[in-house]
């Protein structure tokens, strides 16, 4: 886990919908603290009969405080799970029993009060991470969708916000929306604090900079021999390049 986090830009901590916060959850979170990585919590197995999403949210808030902010909530959990409310986009996502591409609709009237309450909490949490957004929030009591995304991005960078998503991974329900969020909202590597090399010098993530690689794993594969895995921290690496450590 620690090895993977060293080459990860944003960590997604997966929670089993049956059990919520476990020892592994706490250990993984501590690793992200040490490495100063942004964190997203992801609750899976919403179709399990023992899943209690509201209780899991309470567990997360008890463990990690008010920085835990849900982006989504399921309308119902258990074997009949097939819909959730996204309080960033303020839309209902629903699926056919086999999952796949969602149907996106307006939020039904019976869910609007809960959705608005969670939306306002998300707006406030997003505003807290940017002085300009906070001023606008105080003046208008709202933010645009793009402003919310920017506030969430800054909150992730500063570890001032831990968004919560929910999925039923086995049926491909919610996964595509999560991937969309990762593409549109999570911080770019260029926005994150600079890393240092073994000489204590900062390494800027510049494609035109000097070649700098971080080797994070070496394994021995049958019929191949040693295989090393690395992340390019700066510069470019091409097949056949000779690199000096």
Located regions from the model:
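Structural and coupling elements of P-loop NTPases
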Residues: 1-245
């Amino acid at each position: 886990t620690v090895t993977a986090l060293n080459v990860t830009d944003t960590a997604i901590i997966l929670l089993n919908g049956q059990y919520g916060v476990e020892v592994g959850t706490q250990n993984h979170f501590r690793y992200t603290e040490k490495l100063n990585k942004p964190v997203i919590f992801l609750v899976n197995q919403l179709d399990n009969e023992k899943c209690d999403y509201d209780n899991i949210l309470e567990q997360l808030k008890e463990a990690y405080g008010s920085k835990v902010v849900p982006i989504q909530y399921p309308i119902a959990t258990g074997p009949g799970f097939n819909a959730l409310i996204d309080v960033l986009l303020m839309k209902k996502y629903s699926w056919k029993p086999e999952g796949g591409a969602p149907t996106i609709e307006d939020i039904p009237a019976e869910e609007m009060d809960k959705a608005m309450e969670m939306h306002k909490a998300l707006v406030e949490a997003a505003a807290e991470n940017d002085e300009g957004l906070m001023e606008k929030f105080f003046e208008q009591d709202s933010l645009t969708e793009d402003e919310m995304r920017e506030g969430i991005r800054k909150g992730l960078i500063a570890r001032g916000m831990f968004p919560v998503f929910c999925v039923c991974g086995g049926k491909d329900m919610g996964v595509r929306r999560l991937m969309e969020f990762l593409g549109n909202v999570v911080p770019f590597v260029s926005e994150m604090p600079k890393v240092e090399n073994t000489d204590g010098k900062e390494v800027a993530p510049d494609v035109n900079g000097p070649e700098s690689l971080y080797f994070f794993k070496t394994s021995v594969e049958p019929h191949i021999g040693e295989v090393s895995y690395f992340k390019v921290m700066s510069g470019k690496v091409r097949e056949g390049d000779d690199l000096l450590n």
